[in-house]
Amino acid sequence: MSPNSKGVEILSIGTELLLGNITNTNAQWISEQLSQLGLNHFRQSTVGDNRDRIIKVIQEISQRSNLLITTGGLGPTPDDLTTEAIATSFNVSLFERPHLWDEIKQKTSNSKLQDNSSSLRKQCFFPKNAQIINNPRGTAPGMIWEPIKGFTILTFPGVPSEMKTMWKETAFDFIKTKFSDSYSFFSKTLKFSGIGESSVAEKINDLLNLKNPTVAPYANLGEVKLRITARAKNEVEAKNIIKPVKEKLKKKFPKFIFGEDNDTLPSVLIKELAKRNETIVFAESCTGGLLSSSITSISGSSQVFQGSIVSYSNELKNSLLNISEDNLKKYGAVSEEVCEAMAINIKNRLGADWAIGVSGIAGPNGGSQEKPVGLVYISIAGPNNHITNIKKKYNSTRNRIEIQTLSVNVCLNSLRLILLSNSK
C-alpha cells in the first residue's frame, strides 16, 4: 500500500462483542496478518447487530479508507445483517447465487439445519459483481466487493476457525496482490520476568524513539514484553535491522530476559533442566496445583517433572510432607519454616534434584494483620538441600487468581535464575 493511501480498517459486528460476552480474538488475529503484509492499519470499530448503525459506520469508513475487513453477521439468523447492510449502504440489490445454495444443501444434508432452509438461503445473496469467498468450514460465505472506486470490502463470518481458513485460502493472496507494496513488517519479541514495565521503559528511552525498527513495551501479568518491529523487503533484511537492537537489549538486561517470541517460563525451565539432565518436584499449598499445571502444559515436561503434592490442609502437610505438628502450630502453615520443610521433604521423598515449596494466603479471605492476604513464601531446595527462600507481599487488591499466577511466575523465574548462576 503506497504511503499516500488511506489505509485499512477492521469492523467487528455483533452485539455479543459490545456486551463483553465474548472476546474479540478475530480483530487481534487480522491485525497481525495486516502487519505482516506491511499495510497501514489504523482503526478498529465494533458495532452491534443493528442495521442502521452498521450502515452508518460502513458509509463513514468508505470515505476514509481503501480497504474494510468485516467479521460477523453473515449467518442465517434474523440478527445477521452484514451483507444486507453493506448493500443498502451503496444502494444496490442482492442477487442469489444458486450454486451457493446447492453447496449449503450438501453441507447440511445430514443435519437438522436443513429444516431451516429459508433462513439458510439468505446466505446465498450477494451484490451482483461481488467475488465469493468460499467457506469450507461452515455455511456462511464471505465476499470481496468494490462498491465504489478505491474502496474494497472483505466480509468474513465471526467464527474464528472459519474466518482464518477463508483468510488463508483466499483473502491473503488477494490483499497481498492488490494492496501490499514490496515492504512487510517483521517482529521479534523479547520476554522479561522479575522486572516491571516502567523499569524496563526507563532504561531504554533512547530505543523507544527509533523509527525502524520500532521498540514497544507491553505487559502481561507477571511478564513484560518488548516487541522490536522492522519494516523491510524480506525477512533476512528485517533480521539484520532487528539484530543490533536485540543484542543491545540482551546486554542491558542479561538476567531479566528469559526468552523470545513463543518461549514461556515453563518451556525455558524445562529446556534448561533437560539440558542438565536434572529433575524437579513441587509441594504446593496456595497455588493449588497451578505450578504443576504450568509445567505439564508443555510437551516434553515428563523429561524433568516427576510429580507434586498439593497439600492444602495441615493434616496433609503432616501426613504426606512430614511437616511436624509442632512446627505447624508454632510457625503456621504460611511461614518460611514450613515452606522450607515442604521443599526439602518432597525433594528427599521423591528423589529429585530440585524442589519448590510454596505456601501463602491468596485471599480474598483468610488474612490477618500479621499475615495479610497476598503474603506468599517460596522455598527452592537444590543439591545438598541448599535452600533459597523468597518472601513476597502482593497488593491485597489483587484477586486470588492473580496472586496464584504471580506466585507461579516467581517460583519458575527464581529457579531459572539459580540455574543461570550455576551454569554447567
Curated annotation (Swiss-Prot):
Pfam entry (one): CinA
SUPFAM superfamilies per the UniProt record, alphabetical: CinA-like, Molybdenum cofactor biosynthesis proteins
InterPro entries listed in its UniProt record: CinA, CinA-like_C, CinA_C, CinA_KH, Competence-induced_CinA, MoaB/Mog-like_dom_sf, MoaB/Mog_dom
Gene3D superfamilies: 3.30.70.2860, CinA-like, MoaB/Mog-like domain
Domain of life (superkingdom): Bacteria
Similarity field: Belongs to the CinA family.
Name this protein carries in UniProt: CinA-like protein
Provenance organism: Prochlorococcus marinus (strain MIT 9215)
Species classification: Bacteria, Bacillati, Cyanobacteriota, Cyanophyceae, Synechococcales
